């Protein structure tokens, strides 16, 4: 695997010098300063590429070229936004950057309720609490019909939880959910958020798939033409939330994508921390079935709690993800490619890390502190080395 590291650009508290010392050779970044939907010019791409290369690294993967909400709702200026996206892909290819991660999550990108969940060892993790989320949705956001998405027990627990929350607790929970986590391109006020949800009131899973198909049929031929590999990131968490459909959550969704546009440019980001939240997702089977189309991997683990829809981010080698079997399946896919004469390694980044040691005293991007990811990268690197030596060192 190619060892990579997500970097949020010049404002990231983790420097490129830090990234290099962590042992990564590739950088995963994006032009976050360019508004959603606008074309990334060759000039801006080359500027960022030069910064990365001057630090002795390579820009391996774009994460992400964000998709304008008009495309997802198939409204407004969606045709122009699609044309802009096509041009951005052409410009990236011209600059030699050929792997693009993206997602098709409506309104919200990845979502957590607690950004400072304290683990028994004193380090901090990200957590999604189903009851807190229900309390937000029913009692703070007051989304009409939200009760239909919860069990009677969850509704009662959410009311109880809400009753014990201080104003600061409510403000923090709201901020955590709607203000935009790292990599999310949109942050909202509560009123803006309600308005955005309203845009989806007539969009169910079938309709969102229809809109996604329009995007794929416009984008994938361009990607194929210029040699770019698109790698869709799964929904996080991988299930409908806030009454919004989610359409990249299961192996069935992956198969739908391939059936919709059967091109090798139409590929996947294997994010074990997103897919792995669902007990019915067999990660190794996903890798084996869709291995040739996996162009990027995010390796992390989560731990489901008593309510199976509640989870926290576990250490990379713990939790519900069998990291050994996952890495073995990825390495096997790389060797299969090698036997076909393809030398490309699959870029891997240690996804999220616990906030620990002196990062606890620093301002960090939630999930993206340096030391927790350094630990995760070192652990995954060790697993890969052992697998390579044990199975492939002839």
From Swiss-Prot:
InterPro entries: Man_deHydtase (IPR004628), Xyl_isomerase-like_sf (IPR036237). It is an enzyme of class 4 (lyase). GO terms for molecular function: ferrous iron binding; manganese ion binding; mannonate dehydratase activity. Disulfide bonds: none annotated. Pathway: Carbohydrate metabolism; pentose and glucuronate interconversion. It comes from the Bacteria. The keyword Iron applies. Its cofactor is Fe(2+); Mn(2+). Its EC number is 4.2.1.8. It catalyses: D-mannonate = 2-dehydro-3-deoxy-D-gluconate + H2O. Keywords: Iron, Lyase, Manganese. It holds the Pfam family UxuA. Gene3D superfamilies: Divalent-metal-dependent TIM barrel enzymes. GO terms for biological process: D-glucuronate catabolic process. Belongs to the mannonate dehydratase family. Catalyzes the dehydration of D-mannonate. This is Mannonate dehydratase. It comes from Escherichia coli O157:H7 (strain EC4115 / EHEC).
């Amino acid at each position: 695997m190619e060892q990579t590291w997500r970097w949020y650009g010049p404002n990231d508290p983790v420097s490129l010098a830090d990234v290099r010392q962590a042992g990564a050779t590739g950088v995963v970044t994006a032009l976050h300063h360019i508004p959603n939907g606008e074309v990334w010019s060759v000039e801006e791409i080359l500027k960022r590429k030069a910064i990365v290369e001057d630090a002795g690294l390579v820009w391996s993967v774009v994460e992400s070229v964000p998709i304008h909400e008009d495309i997802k709702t198939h409204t407004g200026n969606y045709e122009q936004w699609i044309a802009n996206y096509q041009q951005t892909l052409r410009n990236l290819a011209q600059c030699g950057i050929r792997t693009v991660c993206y997602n098709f999550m409506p309104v919200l990108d990845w979502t957590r309720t607690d950004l400072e969940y304290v683990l028994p060892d004193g380090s901090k993790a990200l957590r999604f609490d189903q009851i807190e989320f229900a309390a937000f949705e029913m009692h703070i956001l007051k989304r009409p019909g939200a009760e239909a998405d919860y069990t009677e027990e969850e509704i009662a627990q959410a009311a109880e939880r809400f009753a014990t929350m201080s104003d600061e607790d409510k403000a923090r929970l709201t901020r955590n959910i709607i203000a935009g986590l790292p990599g999310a391109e949109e942050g909202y006020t509560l009123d803006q958020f309600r308005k955005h949800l309203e845009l989806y009131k007539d969009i169910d899973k079938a309709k969102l798939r229809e809109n996604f198909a329009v995007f794929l049929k416009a984008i994938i031929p361009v990607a194929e033409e210029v040699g770019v590999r698109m790698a869709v990131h799964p929904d996080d968490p991988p299930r409908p939330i806030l009454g919004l459909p989610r359409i990249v959550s299961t192996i069935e969704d992956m198969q739908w994508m391939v059936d919709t546009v059967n091109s090798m440019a139409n590929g996947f980001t294997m994010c074990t921390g997103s897919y792995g939240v669902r007990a019915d997702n067999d990660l190794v089977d996903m890798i084996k079935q869709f291995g040739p189309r996996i162009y990027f991997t995010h390796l992390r683990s989560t731990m489901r709690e008593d309510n199976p829809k509640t989870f926290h981010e576990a250490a990379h080698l713990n939790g519900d993800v069998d990291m050994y079997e996952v890495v073995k399946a990825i390495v096997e896919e790389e060797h299969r490619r090698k036997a076909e004469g393809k030398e490309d390694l699959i870029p891997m980044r240690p996804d999220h890390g616990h906030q620990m040691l002196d990062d606890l005293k620093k301002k960090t991007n939630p999930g993206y502190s340096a030391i927790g990811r350094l630990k995760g990268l070192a652990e995954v690197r060790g697993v890969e080395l052992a697998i390579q030596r044990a199975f492939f060192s002839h």
